[in-house]
UniProtKB/Swiss-Prot annotation:
GO process annotations (BP): intracellular signal transduction; protein ubiquitination
Function: Probable substrate-recognition component of a SCF-like ECS (Elongin-Cullin-SOCS-box protein) E3 ubiquitin-protein ligase complex which mediates the ubiquitination and subsequent proteasomal degradation of target proteins. Plays a role in spindle dynamics and genome integrity by targeting the mitotic progression protein PSRC1 for proteasomal degradation in a cell cycle-dependent manner. Also participates in meiosis by mediating the proper attachment between kinetochores and microtubules.
Pfam families according to UniProt: Ank_2, SOCS_box
Domain SOCS box, residue spans: 265-318
Domain of life of the source: Eukaryota
Name the record gives this protein: Ankyrin repeat and SOCS box protein 7
Keyword Repeat: yes
Keywords: ANK repeat, Repeat, Ubl conjugation pathway
UniProt entry tagged with the keyword Ion transport: no
Pathway where it operates: Protein modification; protein ubiquitination
Family in the record: Belongs to the ankyrin SOCS box (ASB) family.
Length: 318
């Protein structure tokens, strides 16, 4: 036992010495110890390598030296199965990430999953690291990877209200209708009108219902008595006759809350009674034909500006 302690003690001292050098950004000492044979892939009690440590601390020059001396960025720690790239994402260390992504290990780390199925893109979206999100997508990270709970980076960005990340992910064709329309329903439930408008403008399907009860975004607007959301949804094509699993239309849901006059109830009664005009039906159909991926290219269509504005709902009073 004494022999084991004596043998281990110098190793622990070396580990502490090189970690202290990394923390201080002392590249000279780091390089010297590596050249003397210190392995960059040794792991501490948490399973961290020196690459984990330097990536989390933001020590770019140390990361470069470790990679030059054979550091392996695919190693996962014992805390959550995170790679050094996950920690770089957590702290927004985009320049450090670029060093790792330009290495031979890129394909092994860019979509690497933690114990919970989180990729670096999940982490970056969760923490709102928009420049990091851009970098990962530049290096062709999978835009809609599913965690073990079936969550995508876009969903995390929405839940955490990381607006910049949301826009970047949508610009890179993240699935706006993931989990049968989760994003639009979430925006309605949270009464987040700016998100609701953004998703609708980008072509979110207004009529997808929750798998557990069939409630569409318009049903949820009725439940929340949110007339602004209801107007937006209707203008973008929500079907007032869609029924949930209990056989209720949005109007029936609104009446079930209270039969007395309320803005949302009054609106739903009005639009349920009257059919859409031909002009609005044409707009809905044209937007559907253009398709999700091409809606952002409306400005490039060889049509009059007034028609482009109409297709973008710019004249809507909502």
């Amino acid at each position: 036992m004494l022999h084991h302690h004596c043998r281990r003690n110098p190793e622990l001292q070396e580990e502490s010495q090189i970690q202290a050098a990394v923390a201080a950004g002392d590249v000279h000492t780091v390089r010297k110890m590596l050249e003397q044979g210190y392995s960059p892939n040794g792991r501490d009690a948490n399973g961290w390598t020196l690459l984990h440590f330097s990536a989390a601390r933001g020590k770019e020059r140390c990361v470069r030296v470790f990679l030059e001396h054979g550091a392996d960025p695919t190693v996962k720690d014992l805390i959550g199965g995170f790679t050094a790239l996950h920690y770089a994402a957590m702290h927004g260390r985009a320049r450090i990430a670029r060093l790792m992504l330009e290495s031979e290990y890129r394909s092994d780390i860019i979509n690497a999953k933690s114990n919970d199925g989180w990729t670096p893109l999940h982490v970056a979206a969760h923490y709102g690291r928009d420049s990091f999100v851009r970098l990962l997508l530049e290096f062709k990270a999978e835009v809609d990877p599913l965690s073990d709970k079936g969550t995508t980076p876009l969903q995390l960005a929405i839940i955490r209200e990381r607006s910049s990340c949301v826009k970047i992910l949508l610009d890179h064709n993240a699935n706006i209708d993931i989990q049968n329309g989760f994003l639009l329903r979430y925006a309605v439930i949270k009464s987040n009108h700016s998100y609701c408008r953004m998703f609708l403008q980008r072509g979110a399907d207004t009529n997808l219902g929750r798998l557990e009860d069939g409630q569409t975004p318009l049903h949820l607007s009725a439940l929340r008595d949110d007339v602004l959301c209801a107007r937006m949804l209707y203008n973008y094509g929500a079907d007032t006759n869609t029924r949930n699993y209990e056989g209720q239309t949005p109007l029936a849901v609104s009446i079930s809350i209270s039969g007395s006059s309320r803005p949302c109830l009054d609106f739903l009664q009005e639009v349920t009674r009257q059919p859409r005009n031909l002009q609005d039906l044409c707009r809905i159909k044209i937007r559907q034909c253009i398709g999700l991926q091409n809606l952002k290219l409306l400005d490039e269509l060889p049509i009059a500006k007034v028609m482009k504005d109409y297709l973008k709902h710019k004249s809507d009073d909502i």
